[in-house]
Structures are given as structure tokens and as C-alpha cells.
């Protein structure tokens, strides 16, 4: 099965508890469709370059997912319907990167 990098921005008004619930809900959607969540990273509450839906900040999160293309299409369709997710980007990757991403490394410095 192919590997996908799924990055999304959640609303700034979500508490940490609500954000964890959103991530758990997304991961349960994946497992229902036969996909596997390999890695999850929280990048933090970051400023936007421009306002999105009258919001200036958002919670940036990234997931690495192993899934078939049909189940990934279904997952993306359901994420579009979720009002807590403002934007997302899904990319196909060749392999899982080692270590933390640059965003996590920058936030730890």
C-alpha cells in the first residue's frame, strides 16, 4: 500500500483536549477503512500569512498514513466535511522519513 503525508490545519479555538479528540477521530476513520497511522506530529499553534475564515492562527498537524488510494480518497472526503479542519494537504511519499520533521526540530530549539 502507498504511503501518504497528510498535513492539516485545525481551528485556533480548539483546546488541546478537543484537538486530541479530533486526531483520535481521524485515526479511527483511517482504521475503519483499513489504513494505518504510522506517525503523528503536532507542530503547534502557528500564525497564518493571511486570514482564513476570519482566523489568524491554526493548529498545524501532520500524519504519515499507509493506505490504499480508494480508502485515502474516502478519508479526504470525510475530512472536507469536518468543520474543525480549515485546510489540508495530502502527498504521496516514497518512504517514511527518519527522525522528526524540520518543524518539530525548529519548535524544540
From Swiss-Prot:
It comes from the Bacteria. Pfam families: Ribosomal_S6. Keywords: Ribonucleoprotein, Ribosomal protein, RNA-binding, rRNA-binding. GO terms for molecular function: small ribosomal subunit rRNA binding; structural constituent of ribosome. GO terms for biological process: translation. One of its GO terms (cellular component) is ribonucleoprotein complex. Transmembrane segments: none annotated. Binds together with bS18 to 16S ribosomal RNA. Belongs to the bacterial ribosomal protein bS6 family. This is Small ribosomal subunit protein bS6. It comes from Ehrlichia ruminantium (strain Gardel). The lineage of its organism: Bacteria, Pseudomonadati, Pseudomonadota, Alphaproteobacteria, Rickettsiales. The gene is rpsF.
Amino acid at each position: 500500500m502507498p504511503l501518504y503525508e497528510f498535513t492539516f490545519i485545525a481551528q485556533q479555538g480548539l483546546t488541546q483536549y478537543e484537538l486530541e479528540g479530533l486526531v483520535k477521530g481521524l485515526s479511527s476513520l483511517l482504521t475503519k477503512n483499513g489504513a494505518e497511522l504510522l506517525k503523528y506530529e503536532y507542530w503547534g499553534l502557528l500564525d497564518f500569512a493571511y486570514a482564513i475564515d476570519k482566523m489568524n492562527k491554526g493548529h498545524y498537524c501532520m500524519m504519515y498514513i499507509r493506505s490504499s488510494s480508494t480508502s485515502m480518497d474516502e478519508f479526504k472526503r470525510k475530512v472536507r466535511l469536518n468543520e474543525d479542519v480549515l485546510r489540508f494537504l495530502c502527498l504521496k511519499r516514497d518512504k517514511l522519513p527518519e527522525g522528526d520533521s524540520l518543524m518539530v526540530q525548529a519548535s524544540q530549539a
